[in-house]
């Protein structure tokens, strides 16, 4: 068993090519057989590019206001909202303009991400 406390001080600016705009991330749980947990903090208007994962993904919004999009459908999300994205579905997520947004991303331990287009 492992207990991890998520603190803002653990966030680091991300240089990953999937992001558009300023985004901070921190890996919370990694190295598990089946799951990985990452905290992602999108600054106002920042988002990621449309992409897919090889495993299902769950996003749990913890702060702010954001948008999750897939297949032409865009939904506003706020703290307490949970988004389920099936493996292989092209999607994107990020902060609504004028707002920051933080979510926890729960992915399969072996999940691979592919940026679309």
Regions found by a protein language model. Give the residues of each.
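A short hydrophobic beta-strand segment most commonly corresponding to one strand
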Residues: 37, 84, 98-116
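Conserved short histidine dyad/triad with adjacent acidic residue
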Residues: 22, 38-53, 87
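Short beta-strand His + acidic residue motifs that chelate non-heme Fe in jelly-roll/DSBH
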Residues: 48-50, 68-69, 85, 90-97
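A short, N-terminal "cap"/entry segment at the start of jelly-roll beta-barrel domains
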Residues: 1-35, 114-117
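Structural motif
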Residues: 58, 65-67, 74, 90, ...
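Short, conserved beta-strand element in jelly-roll/cupin
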Residues: 40-43, 52-68, 106-108
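Short acidic-glycine-tyrosine-enriched beta hairpin
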Residues: 72-88
């Amino acid at each position: 068993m492992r207990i991890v406390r998520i603190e803002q001080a653990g966030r680091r600016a991300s240089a990953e090519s999937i992001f558009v705009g300023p985004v901070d991330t921190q890996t919370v749980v990694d190295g598990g057989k089946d799951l990985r947990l990452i905290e992602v903090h999108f600054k106002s208007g920042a988002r990621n590019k449309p992409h897919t994962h090889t495993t299902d993904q769950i996003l749990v919004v913890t702060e702010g206001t954001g948008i999750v999009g897939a297949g032409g459908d865009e939904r506003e999300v706020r703290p307490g909202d949970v988004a389920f994205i099936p493996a292989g579905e092209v999607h994107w997520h990020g902060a609504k303009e004028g707002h920051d947004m933080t979510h926890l991303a729960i992915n399969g331990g072996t999940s691979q991400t592919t940026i679309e287009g």
